[in-house]
């Protein structure tokens, strides 16, 4: 299977899922290939016309050097000496997962397919062809430059070494913001599964404690009048339908009652992350960007832009990290609640030897999440023309780490909830039965003293496989 790309509108979040997570290839439509060659020829005609009019015309990266060299046109001798390979492959460190690198390759095509990068079709085909072989290593760390030229230099260096590229094509490979688009898409895809997982695990905790269901009443849908909180209320009602008929008589603890509000906020932030990903993936972000010909400009025009700096993606990833960290705090509170609640304490914490120490593990994961989450502010680093770095990689690393904390924190609550039902001889609500079965397969019921760390690892890994679906994504789960 391949994803057909006819225009940049075809580069969607679902396309990222298929190409980056499932491992499908990319098929560039014939009309897109023709359009790219046509626009490349048009751009070259524009450059020739500008130089004929003014031999010192400044077209960034084509008649000039990059960065601080943008102010002066290159002499013929300097043009002859310019490197034929990419010159920015300098970053190093822990590598990005293959699923993210594949997403970057896909996102790179957005600038190409409608001609705005002025690359030939053979360059776009070579980029798409990278998906059919093992990909270069791209570091997740050390990306502190303006735009994404460091990571993209690592990704496309070998391609530049084996192809005879025009100056604009070399610039087009490393400019723009495909990395930020891919990174926020990766977090958004993971967020969908983590939201469903969190709702299921928290509903299991509600059921184990036999907490009152009035906090999720249908009456609140219209009273709160918020689409995301209403969706959370409905999800919890569905998950808890058919549960134990006898519940706690007085109101539940705050950690139970605020679940729809907190989960509603997660849904709200998830929606923004998905929207940020969709817009980022299809945006033309090249610098300089080729504005296509029209009646007033028959050869088009070329302008320098800041498209390589995606400010929305880091904010969206920060938002996801913050709500995931909040869920870790809720998970820690529910861990303590289940170990102390009158309905479950005797089932889970009747002694000091079995499950009670898990409350300390939950605190550890919650604190790690707190350390990772927060706003990724603009860097004070920079040099010369490149005086403001882009922050997408750091925002992704923080959100990714927070998400891993959430998987572990949810595993603890899930293990306690399933154990409480086991010890009470209580069946879960029908909508939670499959989840409970999955929990017990990785974290069997505890009937005596044993190390629970390996079980926690196994359940966290199982939850990771829920989040990272598809053969490529699963390899990094």
Regions found by a protein language model. Name each.
Residues 2-52, 89, 151-153, 158-477:
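C-terminal auxiliary extensions adjacent to catalytic cores
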Residues 58-82, 87-112, 137-159, 165-182, ...:
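FAD-binding core of FAD-dependent oxidoreductases
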Residues 65-66, 110-111, 131, 144, ...:
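Acidic, glycine-rich active-site loops and adjacent beta-strand->loop/helix elements
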Residues 74-75, 119-121, 186-188, 425:
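Surface-exposed beta-strand edges and their flanking turn/coil or helix-capping segments
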Residues 1-51, 83-138, 143-144:
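Alpha-helical scaffold/interaction cores of sigma-54-like transcription cofactors
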């Amino acid at each position: 299977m391949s994803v057909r790309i006819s225009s940049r509108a075809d580069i969607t979040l679902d396309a990222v899922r298929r190409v980056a997570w499932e491992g499908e290839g990319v098929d560039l439509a014939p009309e897109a290939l023709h359009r790219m060659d046509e626009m490349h020829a048009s751009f070259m005609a524009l450059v020739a016309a500008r130089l004929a009019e003014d031999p010192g015309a400044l077209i960034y990266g084509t008649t000039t050097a990059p960065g601080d060299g943008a102010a002066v046109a290159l002499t013929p001798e300097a043009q002859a000496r310019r490197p034929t390979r990419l010159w920015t492959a300098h970053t190093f460190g822990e590598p990005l997962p293959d699923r993210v690198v594949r997403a970057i390759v896909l996102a790179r095509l957005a600038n190409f397919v409608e001609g705005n990068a002025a690359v030939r079709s053979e360059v776009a085909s070579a980029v798409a062809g990278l998906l059919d072989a093992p990909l270069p290593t791209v570091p997740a760390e050390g990306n502190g430059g303006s735009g994404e030229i460091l990571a993209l230099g690592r990704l496309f260096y070998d391609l530049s070494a084996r192809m005879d590229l025009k100056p604009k094509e070399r610039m087009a490979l490393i400019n723009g913001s495909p990395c930020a688009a891919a990174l926020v898409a990766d977090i958004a895809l993971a967020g969908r599964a983590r939201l469903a997982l969190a709702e299921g695990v928290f509903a299991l905790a509600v059921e184990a404690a036999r907490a009152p269901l009035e906090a999720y009443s249908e009456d609140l849908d219209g009273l709160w009048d918020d689409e995301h909180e209403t969706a959370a209320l409905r999800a919890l009602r569905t998950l808890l339908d058919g549960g134990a008929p006898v519940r706690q008589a007085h109101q539940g603890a705050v950690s139970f009652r605020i679940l729809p509000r907190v989960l509603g906020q997660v849904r709200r932030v998830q929606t923004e992350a998905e929207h940020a990903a969709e817009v980022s993936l299809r945006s033309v972000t090249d610098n300089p960007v080729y504005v296509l010909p029209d009646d007033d400009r028959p050869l088009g025009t070329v302008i320098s832009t800041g498209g390589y700096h995606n400010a929305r993606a880091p904010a969206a990833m920060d938002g996801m990290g913050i709500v995931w960290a909040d869920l870790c705090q809720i998970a820690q509170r529910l861990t303590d609640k289940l170990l102390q609640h009158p309905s479950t304490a005797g089932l889970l914490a009747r002694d000091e030897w079995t499950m009670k120490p898990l409350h300390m593990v939950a605190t550890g994961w919650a604190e790690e999440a707190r350390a990772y989450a927060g706003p990724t502010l603009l860097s004070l680093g920079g040099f010369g023309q490149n005086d403001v770095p882009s922050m997408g990689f750091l925002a992704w690393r923080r959100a990714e780490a927070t998400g891993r904390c959430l998987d572990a924190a949810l595993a603890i609550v899930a293990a306690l909830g399933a154990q409480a039902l086991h010890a009470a001889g209580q069946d879960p609500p029908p909508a939670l039965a499959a989840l409970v079965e999955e929990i017990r397969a990785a974290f069997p019921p505890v009937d005596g003293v044993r190390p629970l760390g390996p079980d926690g690892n196994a359940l966290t890994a199982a939850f990771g496989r829920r989040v990272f679906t598809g053969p490529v994504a699963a390899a990094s789960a």
